[in-house]
């Protein structure tokens, strides 16, 4: 089983699709592609067996949204208290 939710080019899509179609790999979960959105005629994973594909939304769980909101509120509170966090120096 292979899961890629990092970056599309990390995995060779054609090789992964071949491994899935030939039964050398049991399954794959893919949330990222070489081309976003994937082009149907040129993305072999769209036709591969045992591939679970999502449209680059692996980050969008309820837990991650709640955590992100908490971080935003903490950053606003810190800024208003005169103690900004994660300051970018340019």
Q: Where are these predicted regions, by residue range?
A:
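Rossmann-like dinucleotide-binding domain for NAD(H)/NADP(H)
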Residues: 5-90
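Short glycine-centered segments of the SAM/dcSAM-binding site in methyltransferase folds
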Residues: 1
